[in-house]
Amino acid sequence: RQIEVMYTPAHTPGSTTFFDKEHHYGFSGDAFGSTNLLLFGGTFKQLIATTSRTASYMQKHGIEKLFPGHYQGNPETLQRILDEKKMSEEVLSGKRKGEKNNTSGLNSYIYDYGVHIRYNAPEALR
């Protein structure tokens, strides 16, 4: 079996995702998949780059699901990766505004498509 590793920073600076192309799935750890994405030191620019690379890889290699480190039974899909990318782009363009809320040491969040993205403003907006 061959496993490919992709650097997927945003949740944390060192986040990685592991892909098994032969079996069409991957393991995303905390980088994706919990419907509660926490940007601990990450930025929306990083998340946009990470979701772009991940979506391209999933499309190219027919990856159907990414299994997260939390919330088993809730795998990440290509559509959710694309939704997270869109949400992030809207935050940086000013089209989407975050809500204030202290959770897990993060002071803001956005919510849509069944996904929370929690972050620290203004750091994550740079």
Where does each model-flagged region fall?
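Metallo-beta-lactamase
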Residues: 4-83
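Active-site HxH/HxHxD metal-binding segment of metal-dependent hydrolases
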Residues: 1, 34, 90, 94
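Accessory terminal helices/loops
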Residues: 52-126
